[in-house]
């Protein structure tokens, strides 16, 4: 998971908003970074990893990333499917999730390393994206338990891992069998921290 360098936080203004990024991953950033077509390889994900069809796998020939565009759910999506009310930079969905991931990553918890996030503002609304490093060779818990023989200690280890997140005060707004990912060594990872928070 590319833990060779300390995660940094840089904020750079753009024409319509800002980008927050780790400059040990991306030395230079622009809005083009969040366009799948600007990458050497990009592939839209299947729905099995969760989300609303808003995730792309990106590959620059060296490292692999995941790009998520923020979409609304529920009834409100009928009126505004990817725009959110502007309440300030620090309250954007993308910046909040990026910083929450950084907090968890810095505590050596099993989460994807945040690479970059952005927002683009238009009057009282904004749109947003986030890029994280891809966790190698994982599958959703839902798929794992349907296809694999479950090791005897698997559920205990999973419970212990989730407890570690609670010990640091994490509230995950959508913890389900798709946002828990299992790698080849049966280690569990948590993803999708949109609307998550740290609570005392």
What is each PLM-predicted segment?
Residues 69, 134, 175, 193-195:
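Generic detector of well-ordered alpha-helical packing
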Residues 178-200:
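Catalytic activation segment of kinase domains across protein kinase-like and atypical kinase folds
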Residues 167-177:
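Catalytic-loop of the protein kinase fold
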Residues 140-148:
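AlphaC helix of the protein kinase catalytic domain
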Residues 1-49, 188-189, 197:
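Regulatory N- and C-terminal appendages and interdomain linkers associated
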Residues 31-138, 163, 167:
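Conserved ATP-binding subdomain of kinase catalytic cores across diverse folds
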Residues 125-127, 159, 173-175:
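Short gly/pro-enriched beta-turn/loop segments at secondary-structure junctions
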Residues 150-161:
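Conserved alphaE helix
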